[in-house]
């Protein structure tokens, strides 16, 4: 699957995120894609409208369920190549890391491929 950014021009992505944010003020527009070279399944959809008060850990749980990942398999999500804190609210992560087009881009992987904030 090609990436959301490569499929849609910037102007279209920006217009869509602005429409979403004005229509759903307490939601965060998130694009969730599997990291390259990851061995876990592709998620069935990549666009999410996430409640602002959802934690990163709760979002990981949503993704885990959508890809039907067994409990013994690990999953990590990355925002700008860093591992966000599990207890962080998605709204706070969005405010800090949203793209110029207005979406928050999240990658997921079965391995800790990028390291964590403590290692950088």
Swiss-Prot record:
Phosphatidylethanolamine amidated glycine: lipidated positions: 115
Topology of this chain in the membrane: Lipid-anchor
Gene Ontology BP term (one): mitophagy
Keyword Transport: yes
Any one annotated GO CC term: fungal-type vacuole membrane
Posttranslational modification: The C-terminal 5 residues are removed by ATG4 to expose Gly-115 at the C-terminus. The C-terminal Gly is then amidated with phosphatidylethanolamine by an activating system similar to that for ubiquitin.
Xref: SUPFAM superfamilies: Ubiquitin-like (SSF54236)
Gene Ontology terms, MF aspect: phosphatidylethanolamine binding
UniProt KW keywords: Autophagy, Cytoplasmic vesicle, Lipoprotein, Membrane, Protein transport, Transport, Ubl conjugation pathway, Vacuole
Function: Ubiquitin-like modifier involved in autophagosome formation. With ATG4, mediates the delivery of the autophagosomes to the vacuole via the microtubule cytoskeleton. Required for selective autophagic degradation of the nucleus (nucleophagy) as well as for mitophagy which contributes to regulate mitochondrial quantity and quality by eliminating the mitochondria to a basal level to fulfill cellular energy requirements and preventing excess ROS production. Participates also in membrane fusion events that take place in the early secretory pathway.
Family per record: Belongs to the ATG8 family.
Name of this protein: Autophagy-related protein 8
Organism: Eremothecium gossypii (strain ATCC 10895 / CBS 109.51 / FGSC 9923 / NRRL Y-1056)
């Amino acid at each position: 699957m090609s990436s959301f950014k490569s499929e849609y021009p910037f102007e279209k992505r920006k217009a869509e995120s602005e429409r979403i944010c004005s229509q759903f003020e307490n939601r965060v527009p998130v694009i969730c894609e599997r990291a390259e070279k990851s061995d876990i399944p592709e998620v069935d959809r990549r666009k999410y409208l996430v409640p602002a008060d959802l934690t990163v850990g709760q979002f990981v749980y949503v993704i885990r369920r959508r890809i039907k990942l067994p409990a013994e398999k690990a999953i990590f999500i990355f925002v700008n190549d860093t591992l966000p804190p599990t207890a962080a609210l998605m709204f706070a992560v969005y405010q800090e890391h949203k793209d110029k087009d207005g979406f928050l881009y999240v990658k997921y992987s079965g391995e800790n491929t990028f390291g964590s904030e403590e290692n950088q």
